[in-house]
Amino acid sequence: MLRKKYSVIILAAGQGKRMLSSIPKVMHKIAGRSMLQHLIDSVSKINIQSIYIVYNESLREFIPTIYSNKCTISIYWVLQESVRGTGYAVQQVLSMIHDDNEDILILYGDVPLISDKTLNNLCLMKSKCDIGLLTAYVKNPQGYGRIIRNQYGDVVSIIEDIDIVNQNDRIIKEIHSGIFISVSGYLKSWLNYLIENNLWCNELYLTAIIDIAYKNNFVINAIHPVDVCEVIGINNKSDLVKAERVYQIKEAQKLLELGVMISDLNRFDLRGKLVCGEDVCIDVNVIIEGCVSLGNRVKIGASCILKDVEIGDDVIIYPFSFIENSKIHCKSKIGPFARLRPGTCLQEQVHIGNFVELKNIKLGNNSKVGHLSYLGDADVGNYVNIGAGTIICNYNGKTKNYTCIEDNVFVGADSQLVAPITIGKNAVIGAGTTVTQNVDKDDVIISRVRQFSIVNDKVDKNKKN
């Protein structure tokens, strides 16, 4: 664990024109979180005290959505005064930092996959040098700044991709991720030198300080990330999609190593936190959002969506089911094509069939809702059977009303239960019944037009009434 506290500068003021979107680039999402949030979550795991985020005006409306999981970390938002390059952006923040001995970790908002392990390694290296760079070897370095080393292997400068004129420099495979660490006093001095000596063109590149530091005998070291994929830079939606898949495959691989059976690493999406018991099986195209807990021997069918769900042991979720903010106890079976909306709680061995929608409801042990039904705002007891096509009419146009169905009730197909209403134990509701009044226990209720037939050979069956 790092003992010294660091401050972090996140450069997030880029225009992101290549994203072709009205949404600021750093607010585009990977695994359900913005790129900026990914960075904040990573740096919050190391020993930092402050985060300075340099942003442009288009990001202002998104500021309330950004947070740190650690209350001890302060986040400062710094509006970029003018688009004059990364050097000026950092200098703007440095004017707010009065301790010239403070170590500053600089990150880029469009490099979101950096891990806390890599950042921790970079910070630890800082004790042995004046500048610590995060570099990587990549197959295709196009678009990245290249690391220039001398014959002894020392880093002497960084040349931006746009400024490369020498073919030998162009084929260099070691790239600068944009991420580095140094001391605030040094950064101030180097940037002031560049400005005072007019050693810049239209924009002041932060990377220009490396050449100055080397020529003044400062020690520059470089390390590589734990995984080269961490330094993927995102400039357009194609990059975003690639980064998403890289992230998801890594998360799926972690789950496999923990014993979870993921049918296809390329067809699994984790957009939150997943906790699993033993022998859990997850089929293809499953999406996990929010906080999801799966008990032992749970099976999730293809194309299911689970959002903020707690599922007990031996539960089977059949394909194409959507479950959110719900709790399902052990040995229950759900779906296919079931929808469980917020507030649903299923006790043990409950069966929910295809095309059933539940909302704000509790179903007791061994109760069944077979198919084609809607139940909302209700408390259903144990061993209740709800026939196909049953609807709880819980909304009168102004307010939602509550329904109570006690133990061992049988509700026939195509019934309507008009809330507020209570149905007593062991009652039977005949098929096609509309129930508008409370039903006592053991009662049998039928309310429908009696069937009758018309015998008339002269009736033209093809005539329209």
UniProtKB/Swiss-Prot annotation:
Which residue ranges are recorded for the region named Pyrophosphorylase?
1-237
PROSITE patterns attached here? Answer: HEXAPEP_TRANSFERASES (PS00101)
Positions binding acetyl-CoA in this chain are 388, 394-395, 431, 448
One BP term from GO: regulation of cell shape
- Kindly state which reaction or reactions the protein catalyses: alpha-D-glucosamine 1-phosphate + acetyl-CoA = N-acetyl-alpha-D-glucosamine 1-phosphate + CoA + H(+); N-acetyl-alpha-D-glucosamine 1-phosphate + UTP + H(+) = UDP-N-acetyl-alpha-D-glucosamine + diphosphate
EC id:
2.7.7.23, 2.3.1.157
Which key words tag this protein in UniProt? Acyltransferase, Cell shape, Cell wall biogenesis/degradation, Cytoplasm, Magnesium, Metal-binding, Multifunctional enzyme, Nucleotidyltransferase, Peptidoglycan synthesis, Repeat, Transferase
Its primary localisation, in coarse terms, equals: cytoplasm
User: Which cofactors, by name?
Assistant: Mg(2+)
Q: Name a GO molecular-function annotation.
A: magnesium ion binding
- Region annotated Linker sits at 238-258
Cellular component annotations (GO), alphabetically ordered: cytoplasm; membrane
Q: CDD domains in the record, alphabetically?
A: GT2_GlmU_N_bac, LbH_GlmU_C
Q: Where in the cell is it found?
A: Cytoplasm
On subunit structure and binding partners, the annotation says: Homotrimer.
- Role of this protein: Catalyzes the last two sequential reactions in the de novo biosynthetic pathway for UDP-N-acetylglucosamine (UDP-GlcNAc). The C-terminal domain catalyzes the transfer of acetyl group from acetyl coenzyme A to glucosamine-1-phosphate (GlcN-1-P) to produce N-acetylglucosamine-1-phosphate (GlcNAc-1-P), which is converted into UDP-GlcNAc by the transfer of uridine 5-monophosphate (from uridine 5-triphosphate), a reaction catalyzed by the N-terminal domain.
Which protein family is it in? In the N-terminal section; belongs to the N-acetylglucosamine-1-phosphate uridyltransferase family. In the C-terminal section; belongs to the transferase hexapeptide repeat family.
- NCBIfam families of this UniProt entry? glmU
Protein name in UniProt: Bifunctional protein GlmU
Organism, by scientific name, is Blochmanniella floridana
Q: Gene encoding this polypeptide?
A: glmU
